[in-house]
């Protein structure tokens, strides 16, 4: 059971109602994360704004999901693991074996570049972005740029907002996402 109210369009603070309507229209349901964030309309606005910016960063859609899933796993957020697994499998059509490797933080054997991204993301989180020159160089040697490195930090910051909000609230996973938990 959630430690925070999970708002609907009807119960949300006035400042969050339009955002919830937009999410409902876009997804066909309101993810419980959004209902939780509606308790703080500025947190919900931040999520939507930063999410939009993250969606147009220098990483590909697949690479952004690697960052999001890796962060969710490291931060212990089952809700976000499920949500981003659904995106990876259903929207991006990634192979289940690849998604399972990302979720397990194991080596991504079939794609060295994505593996370098996952390792970099993991290291950014665990070392609070205090990477050695060799750790950074391994990322660049895989074909990534300094812009990509900063966009990983952007993705991790978005994930941290979501993961921590879900962990704080003990957000239950929506039925629409249960299959991907």
Predicted regions and their residues:
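Hydrophobic alpha-helical segments
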Residues: 1-181
């Amino acid at each position: 059971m959630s430690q925070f109210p999970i708002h609907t369009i009807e119960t949300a603070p006035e400042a969050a109602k339009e955002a919830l309507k937009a999410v409902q229209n876009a997804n066909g349901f309101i993810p419980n994360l959004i209902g939780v964030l509606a308790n703080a309309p500025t947190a919900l606005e931040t999520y939507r704004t930063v999410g939009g910016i993250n969606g147009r960063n220098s990483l590909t859609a697949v690479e952004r999901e690697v960052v999001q899933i890796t962060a969710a796993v490291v931060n212990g957020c089952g809700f976000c693991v499920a949500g981003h697994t659904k995106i990876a499998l259903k929207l991006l059509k990634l192979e289940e074996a690849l998604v399972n490797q990302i979720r397990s933080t194991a080596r991504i054997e079939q794609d060295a570049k994505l593996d370098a991204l996952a390792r970099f993301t993991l290291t950014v989180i665990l070392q609070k972005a205090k990477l050695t020159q060799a750790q950074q160089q391994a990322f660049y040697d895989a074909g990534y740029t300094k812009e990509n490195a900063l966009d990983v930090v952007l993705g991790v910051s978005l994930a941290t907002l979501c993961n921590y909000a879900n962990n704080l609230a003990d957000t239950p996973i929506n039925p629409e996402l249960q299959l991907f938990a």
